[in-house]
Amino acid sequence: MIRQIELGDLKGLNGAYRYDQKDAAPDFFEVHEHAVKMGLDDVVIRRLQKLGVTKSPSGIKADVGINKAYLSLKMSGVGKSSLINHQTRSGFIKIFGSNSDAFQLLDAEVLKYIKCRRDRLITEDVGLDKREEFNIFISDSFRHAFRSIFDYFVFEGTVGWGASKFPAECILSFGKALDPSTWSVYQRNEYYDHCWPSLVFSLRRHGRPKFRVADRAWFLGADDGAPKGQLSLRI
């Protein structure tokens, strides 16, 4: 079930953020309206800084707390959010174990993806149309097993930091960050099914990853000789 949520006031709280319904909220949006008229986006940024609202550390899954509930913020429409950000094969093994159904089914699908890439049947990003056409990342068994991986990275934690001190209880999806009419809340038990048709899988290279032996099975050659071997998931 999707619910619209009401306007409130942003305040920092121990590395996560709280959004209480208070009279100060109109002040925040008054600043935003002024910034739009003047073309001064940094006015909004300065106001947020004064309120103690900053980017959460990477080990924290909840971006904001609203009415004592911790939420993760996800953008819809243009600038869609990343759900799994450049993760290696060994990272999935570390969290889920090499013998788990979740990892083994994911591993098999990534290998199918790599074969399709090498055969030039698909390009880097694989959305629903290509998933269905080439039967990758789409089977019922994969959909069932992948839920635990999805839920971990979206709500619970990361590979590097482990379980988050502030796990997300639900998702606040927004089209325009400062337009509450575009905000919707998804509970944990409904967000995966909501995202399923929109999931885009890709194998990329980001930064200078420290690959391990276990990562080699996912290596996909590139023109510069450096392999692509990190799985990304976005909507």
Regions from the PLM with identified roles:
Residues 1-62, 66, 70-235:
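Short, positively charged
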